[in-house]
Amino acid sequence: MGKTLDVAVLVGSLRKDSINRKMANALAELAPEELKLSIVEIGQLPIYNQNADENPPAGWKAFRERIRAADAVLFVTPEHNRSVPAALKNAIDVGSRPYGQSAWNGKPGAVVSASPGGVGGFGANHHLRQSLVFLNVPAMAQPEAYCGGADKFFDANGKLINDGTRQFLKDFMQAYNTWVIANIKS
């Protein structure tokens, strides 16, 4: 595949020192050269309201265009109440509407969940996967990425310091590269 593939990365946490933003940055650094990962900011997206579909806010339009332009999507999220944070759910909803015009349709995807807790965002990871099935986002099934104890993976500057995690994420990104190439819309 000769061209570099554009991967839109959505980080579920809006927190300034987010573990998941650090994780997304690490994934970008470890990605094979065929993939260019860029974080799509979701914190300022207006809350989805179907009443605005006929005259959508500029933020919705720009977000939808950015997702449509991407070759693939990667979600990096913490877990809030066994689900994804509200900002990520809102972004998913904004990108999926109006009905029949989803920006997500057919884009190969993957989910990485990270948290300080031991289960590594398992609930959020699987809840998000349910939405991706409905949105026709073929999500990579293996390897799965539940990164528990993730607060210990990074130094004060946000750099990945855990060698085992580095190798796992490198392998994950290689598998994701293969998945994207196999599932990309032509």
Segments from the language model and where they lie:
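Helix-loop-strand module that forms the ligand-binding subsite of alpha/beta enzymes
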Residues: P56-N136
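N-terminal beta-loop-helix "entrance" segment that forms/cooperates
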Residues: I42-A58, F154
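A general structural signal for well-ordered alpha-helical segments in protein cores
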Residues: V7, N20, A24, W60, ...
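Glycine-rich phosphate/pyrophosphate-binding loop and the adjoining helix
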Residues: G2-T4, A8, N49, P138-S186
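N-terminal beta1-alpha1 ligand-phosphate binding loop
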Residues: G2-E34
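A generic structural motif
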Residues: P32-S38, P138
